[in-house]
Amino acid sequence: MKNPIIDNIPCVLLAGGKSSRFITNNIQTNKALMPLKSYSSLLEYQYTRLLKLFKKVIISTKKSYELNAPYLLEKESDLFSPLFGIHNAFLTLQTPYIFFIPIDTPLVSFESIKALCGIKNFSVVYAKSPTKEHYLISLWHQSTLNALNYALKTQNYRLSDLIKNASSTAIHFDKEEEFLNLNTLKDYELAVQILKEGSNG
């Protein structure tokens, strides 16, 4: 069955992180470029997969990659916070709602994404699994722009502070595995294994 495309909300793939804990052969590695399934990179896998669900997918990053895709470039070169990408996305895309997802969460199901995109009366709707909140797997409304401006001006980069002070709500999902974050090589190897066994998009 073909997924009905979400055409009224763009998806921004957050890929401006540091990969500081991702070590292969004692070298810090950019996890965005690790191969996944039949794709040359995690970046390509996530971008291609999300295009099956969203009409518009844009990659938020500090520099563009070889992958032919639309990019939103974060200007802050030495500061790493997803708030820059979120803020920049609203300023650039000029759209009421944006769905954000980090590059390193390749197992989130389309059902979960659709559930998050289906709730429209909050500033932020984010995913919550049995053990933690996933603030970056979330639907944001442009009404958060003032709070984003203020957070960046005061250099309070804690996402949880901003979200708790906004009119936000969590959607509870019961599958922890789906929200696996590829912070380390071990996480990556686990995701490769899970994708071999199942079919996540």
Swiss-Prot record:
Cofactor(s) annotated in UniProt: Mg(2+)
One term of GO molecular function: metal ion binding
Major location (coarse): cytoplasm
Subunit structure: Monomer.
Record remark: domains: The N-terminal domain determines nucleotide recognition and specific binding, while the C-terminal domain determines the specific binding to the target protein.
Role noted for this protein: Transfers a GMP moiety from GTP to Mo-molybdopterin (Mo-MPT) cofactor (Moco or molybdenum cofactor) to form Mo-molybdopterin guanine dinucleotide (Mo-MGD) cofactor.
Official protein name in the record: Molybdenum cofactor guanylyltransferase
Organism: Helicobacter pylori (strain G27)
